[in-house]
Regions:
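Non-heme di-metal
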Residues: 1-251
């Protein structure tokens, strides 16, 4: 159990009012289950151990979040019953690609929350290592994809590429549904994409995307240059910046 700092009244109100805690706890719990279930099917001992560590860290993130909401009296909706996925590889890929999206925006939002003072320094210090672990998770995942693709039989590759495509379609469809739920006042599952407004910041969309790109590069820079980096989301973000780059604020 972490010794959570006592926050000022305004800071505590800001933190407890964020519409993310239910889904954050549930997402980490589900991610831990998906990753650990896939690890059980991996025959290589070293790779299995690495994936198990990934799953352990996902579950640890869940406990950190659960301790936070308990410490600050945040009410959570009851968690659903999680069942082991029937297709462990699909579940692992959904979790991995989903984290590639969410972590990219989370890097920028965390930076914005830190710089604007929305997150008090005490919480920044607590969560910065968690954010760094998410960077390592997505780096591990995209290199697993490359390794898995290279080592599978040629006849399996078309099926695998279709599976990758299906995962992306699923994630896009899921986020479209999330956006609809948010507009109807439900819990904000898509906070990592819509979070600038929730943070009460006057950062415009172009500025937020630019921060996300810079923070994504910074978080991944310390790792071996031979390792592959997530490319799709940063690539799309850079294209978006050509059209909606940071706007100059009027005096």
């Amino acid at each position: 159990m972490l010794d959570w700092p006592k926050l000022g009244e305004e800071a505590e109100k800001r933190i407890t009012a964020l519409p993310i805690w239910d889904i954050a706890v549930q997402t980490e719990n589900r991610a831990g289950l998906n990753v650990c279930t896939y690890a059980e099917s991996v025959p290589d001992p070293l790779l299995r151990k690495a994936i198990e560590l990934n799953g352990f860290e996902e579950r640890r993130h869940r406990h950190v979040l659960a301790n936070l909401v308990e410490a600050y009296g945040i009410k959570l909706a009851p968690e659903p019953v999680y069942e082991k996925p029937k297709d462990p590889e699909w579940a692992f890929m959904v979790t991995g690609y989903s984290e590639c999206i969410d972590s990219f925006f989370a890097f920028g939002l965390f930076k914005a929350a830190k710089d604007t003072g929305y997150f008090p320094p005490e919480l920044v210090q607590t969560f910065d290592p968690v954010v760094n672990e998410e960077a390592r998770h997505i780096l591990f995942f995209v290199n697993w994809v490359a390794w898995h693709r290279r080592n599978m039989p040629l006849w399996r590759r078309p099926y695998f590429e279709l599976k990758v495509f299906a995962v992306w379609i699923f994630l896009i469809y899921e986020r479209m549904g999330i956006a609809s739920d948010v507009s109807n006042g439900q819990q904000d599952n898509n906070f990592t994409v819509t979070g600038a407004e929730q943070l009460g910041s006057d950062i415009n969309v172009g500025e937020l995307i630019a921060i996300c790109v810079a923070e994504n590069d910074r978080r991944l820079k310390p790792y071996d240059v031979r390792l592959k980096r997530p490319r799709f989301v940063p690539f799309m973000a850079r294209i978006a910046l050509k059209f909606i780059g940071p706007k100059k604020k009027t005096a």
